[in-house]
Amino acid sequence: MHTRMQIRNRVNFGKITDLNLLPNLIYVQKKSFDWFLQSEVKDPTKRLNQGLEAVFRESFPIESPNNDMVMEYGHYVLGEPKRDPQECKDTDSSFAVPLKAVIRLIIKDTGEIREQVVYMGDLPVMTDHGTFIINGAERVVVSQLHRSPGIFFSYDQVRDTFSARVIPYRGSWLEFEMDNKGILVAKIDRKKKFPATLLVKAMGMGTNEEVLRLFYGSSKMKIAGANPKDLKRLIGRRTIADIINMETGEVMLDAGSKINEDNISILREMKVKEVDVIEFPKGKDNPVLINCLEKDGVNDYEDAVKKFHTIMRPGEPSTIENAEAELKRLFFSPKTFDLGIVGRYKINSKFEFNNPKEFSKADDRVLRKQDIIETVRYLVMLMSEAENYYPDDIDHLGNRRIRSVGELIANQLKLGFSRVERVIKERMTVQEPEQQTPQLLISIKPITAVINEFFGSSQLSQFMDQTNPLAELTHKRRLNALGPGGLSRDRAGFEVRDVHYSHYGRMCPIETPEGPNIGLILSMSSFARVNDYGFIETPYRLVKNGKVQKQVEYLTADKEEYHYMAQSNSTVDEKGEFTSKLISTRHRGDFPFRSPAEIQYMDLAPLQVVSVSTALIPFLEHDDANRALMGSNMQRQAVPLLTEEAPFVGTGMEARAAYDAGVCIVAKKDGVVSKVDATGVWIKEDQSKEIVHYPLIKFKKTNQGTCFNQKPNVSMLHTTTGGKVSKVSKERVEVTTPNGEKETHELLLSDEVQFHAVVKEGQEVGIGAPVAGQIIKGEKYGDFGQILQKGTVLANGPSTDAGYLALGRNVLVAFMPWEGYNFEDAILISERIIKDDVFSSIHIEEFEIQARETKLGQEQITRDIPNLSDKAFRDLDESGVIRVGAEVKPGDILVGMVTPKGETDLTPEYKLLHSIFGEKAKEVRDSSLRMPNGFEGTVIDIKRYSRETGDELAAGVEEMVKVYVARKRKLLVGDKMAGRHGNKGVVARVMAQEDMPYMEDGSPVDIVLNPLGVPSRMNLGQIFETQLGFAAKKLGINFETPVFDGASEGDVNDFCKKAGLPENSKFQLYDGRTGEKFINQVFCGYIYMLKLAHLVDDKIHARSTGPYSLVTQQPLGGKAQFGGQRLGEMEVWALEAYGASHTLQELLTIKSDDMLGRARIYEAIVKGIHSIKPGIPESFNVLVQELRGLALDIIIKDSEGLEVDISDYEDEFSKNKKKIKFETIENV
């Protein structure tokens, strides 16, 4: 049987979690790019107005300034990519398709139509795994979390005022707020303020009465014949309309005026029978709008519009046409103001605009007059504390939406197309109409520029984290609140970073970086998906009349507000009815108890709260949130190991995470394995009967320098002896050997692993011939990316074991202090771990050299390098490139190359040599590619590209060679390790296996951790994992304990009993050095440990002689620059305190930046002189020049008061040291 087929039984403790309902975990990326490109739509005329199509439609038609021609858009056409993704990586090119568009130019005078297919540039396209390849590097466009367009109402606690903001997708912001005088004012783009009623009147409500009737109710109160009590009630009320004396035409009371006793008397005298008064909400007098009406000073529509124009455009003539045009430009023109579909949806849902007769269509993307009026009305109601009117919570997920990759690219292209439009209009005016064609008018430079800028340098287009499959998957599911149009790190306060109740099931409350980005970079929860409007939805089971239905509904955060949600672990009987009379529910930010009849929805799974990374932590419920955060983040840093091993204690999420990460090869269709080797898997498909080849990726470098390698996960059954097939059934194949013995091959190994016979009864088979191939299932997906049938994993990728995510290894751990070697999270490990390559990993580095055409001639890749010994060439081939398999160390030549030197006039003798020997006699300089410091390993691959062989290379490059060097890294002292619970530490000592503490059966432990790392960190999950891990090892099974739905303490104890282990998992250990018992029993078991990408080899560094800074002449800093260690002010204090004056002087001068002193010390070492006189440090000269830059004339004098020229001073080699003081002009 094939060695990969190690089938371990799995025990899942989950009672609720159904992972089949999980959507495809990278569906967010794929769906968004499909929305943008619409490549599935075969007929271009049937494309929807979205994404790329919308960009074209918004930009065209383009009319010439003098109206003599117009350019129209037909449709766009996508070509085929030139190379496949792997080729693009190898050749440093982008995985892109040519974008062409059918453009028509119509000459209006003649009616002539000139149609052309115009090339619009190369558009990068997404790979099957949701990534882009730009210049050979795999990149991810991260989804952005930004404030949704719409209308928002907020409350300022300090000023005790309400305000409203209309935020469009594109265009001017409109704000309403209270000023200090109690007047409701409006602001456009945070400029000049004006009374809000002025804007309302400019909408067509001209008079004060019309405005008041618009926002308030009214009631009639009798005056004629009213009794004194009723008249008293009238005092203090406000009129809704002007009260006019009919005889004189005089306004007795303005609309909004308060009625007092004198007014009543006058009204009675005028024989007014009844008065229309304002009915304020809740009966409270709130004169906010009346104050505005007094302030705005206009009483009809025309005056209002003109005054508005004067405020917005002071100095310009205010005619009614100008004023109306300005108002239209600001809010009612699709060219300058766009709410977006989302903004319109938010406004319609806020003000319940769902009546199609009353309003125009719902996708009307400009502002409507009714929107402004309703905004003011809502604000007035908020100020009056009316019922069911609340300010918005800006941190609520109903008010924040996701801008995914498709939308981000579309926004960038809009920018490019607007620049193209300007160029087209300019060219239309310059050239004659007869000569013009679409191709000549369109310049694609702005489009390619914005595409390159976005993918190359945008904050949201990121170099993919490819350390392991989980890092890759999480990067694609990341949400970023930063970036253009988002928040900034410095201005983001605590509230926006904090966990909000609306994040439940949508964004993970655990996974976020530590440091300045905390709470701004988040991860989507495992079941979450993004709807068409960009809002995150999470699934719930519907509850009808207290019965839980099978139907699943996805809800956004704002829709969830109105419902009571039961938790997924609420007990339900077979009929779907709740067993308790009171159920714990969630409603907004509270957790009230409700009867089953009041519940509308129930959580789908406990897992839906957390992200994929957090869902991989077993016993998460026993860990403190801070440590769980570290555990989630550190799993992404785990280095893929040489031999992968799935955890004994997992969560059930491992298979799905590995499957969706895209590192495994998955069967597309049903079939049977017909051949397997190290390079690929061949499947005979059931339907087509064709044999399909799935090639494997072998030893490729990832973005982070880890090793990407795929190994077969399926197999065939082979005979060991050969003979005649005597029996073939569904269950087994029997082969009778020549000497009459029977060889039986079982075909049904488990539910997942089954074989199909590929031989017939009576057939003769040779030794090692295949008799059965594994049965393969093809993958099938639903509409929303959910898996209907999981495809068989044909090959494991990095960090995967039999299709399960395997980031680390299971090791035998003892929690005990050991002579201080595990003090403060340090880790003591056994030498067995290094001997057996338990935590060894392969790392691959790429080195590249380019031979260019220079002014002095062409650079040559050659073995013919001047002034080098034969030893340097020992591994180079005849063309000067190192052989595959060569062991290389720092300084070794990887590729030999020479560059021509500048030549002076040649002597006749030299010319003769040159003519005889050709190029060899020319002056050349060695510019070979050498192994840099700190790197060593084995050359595993060479890639050569040359113009001569037809390869496409960058301008000026004639030849390019890439050398790939692999290195096996064993676990070393100083390497960082961690568990899944935030329990991290550094390897402090490697102990001989025989000296490690050992158990009663003689088996030594692999790793010793400090027990003091557990109580204060409160990550008890590691204790449960260790205990259950030992039971798994003993019983030969793997456990799955889903988060918040996993094994209880009782379950763990039961399995320990079954495995014959003590319930407390404490054992008597013996000291490996003495053989004596330890005094107390020690807690032992199997824990899953990871080796993180913080390896000591990448960090440790020592400088011998290296580069110096040009200005200060001090050694550079950092490992990359081969720099030195900084001697800072604290170190200087320490030496001063110690009185080590000579040591200090030496460190500050000749060992740092005293150039003359450096030369002297070298000479002294050569000549054997021991007395060294330090000179002036270069930083002193820099200081003098800095002071001169401040216009201070610095004069340097010696102890005798004579002026010293620093340059002269440096020339004097043997003079005694001079005491120097420096003075400025002021104190001379």
UniProtKB/Swiss-Prot annotation:
It is an enzyme of class 2 (transferase). One of its GO terms (molecular function) is DNA-directed RNA polymerase activity. The keyword Transport does not apply. Its EC number is 2.7.7.6. One of its GO terms (cellular component) is DNA-directed RNA polymerase complex. One of its GO terms (biological process) is DNA-templated transcription. Pfam families: RNA_pol_Rpb2_1 (PF04563), RNA_pol_Rpb2_2 (PF04561), RNA_pol_Rpb2_3 (PF04565), RNA_pol_Rpb2_45 (PF10385), RNA_pol_Rpb2_6 (PF00562), RNA_pol_Rpb2_7 (PF04560). PROSITE patterns: RNA_POL_BETA. Keywords: DNA-directed RNA polymerase, Nucleotidyltransferase, Transcription, Transferase. Belongs to the RNA polymerase beta chain family. NCBIfam families: rpoB (TIGR02013). This is DNA-directed RNA polymerase subunit beta. It comes from Leptospira biflexa serovar Patoc (strain Patoc 1 / ATCC 23582 / Paris). The lineage of its organism: Bacteria, Pseudomonadati, Spirochaetota, Spirochaetia, Leptospirales.
